[in-house]
């Protein structure tokens, strides 16, 4: 559902390309608008390529004898090496839960199987290998009723890891983006707590403290900041440069240290009138 929802917000983009397992109504709509033209693809240029299609009748009518659409077996479309031939490949996959090390469960709820694994691992790996690629796991921060966090301290008993923590680079919820690539377990846990629902953050942090993944002094970030209008992130443009303004989060501790370490003694005294 999340990948399909993303398509609805791409109407103002241009020159997009598709290399996917599935063609759906959302892709057809963007192709008809000219948003998807595959002009800049570096593999299968000018073609939307997939393994199968599913959707309303308009999908089947659109792909029938369409010279701009090609279907290939899954061993071709899902090959990470072939996926990676597309520069700036963005792979967006959903998940049922993600633990604080970055392990992704996407096919089961505990012992109950919910779906198959599909091509998630293939496309996450392919996007990771792509020049400028972005492998993304996206999910709501809670279950539909809001009672259970989907960012969890440990995987639900019986749940299976589909995508390992070694392959996950970005996890996205409605509360932001957790960047995991190259991060330690401590940094990963703090990044993921940052994008969990605010009402679950303290509990998640307490659990990782218990396992000594983070120091005892570590605190969670505030759930809202009045200075920003109770939002957690704001984007703006100044002098033709894009900026992102957000509160400092626990995951930023090392960046803050490096910021201070970059100052010489004169700067420290002039800025803070104190040795740091």
Q: What spans do the regions from the language model cover?
A:
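Long, charged amphipathic helices and adjacent flexible linkers at domain junctions
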Residues: 217-235
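A short beta-loop-alpha structural element at the N-terminal edge
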Residues: 242-258
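Conserved phosphate- and dinucleotide-binding cores of soluble alpha/beta proteins
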Residues: 1-219
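Conserved GNAT-fold acetyl-CoA-binding loop/helix
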Residues: 264-276
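Nucleic-acid processing machinery
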Residues: 225-227, 252-255, 268
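Secondary-structure boundary/capping micro-motif
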Residues: 237-239
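Edge strands and adjacent loops of beta-rich recognition modules
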Residues: 227-229, 247, 276
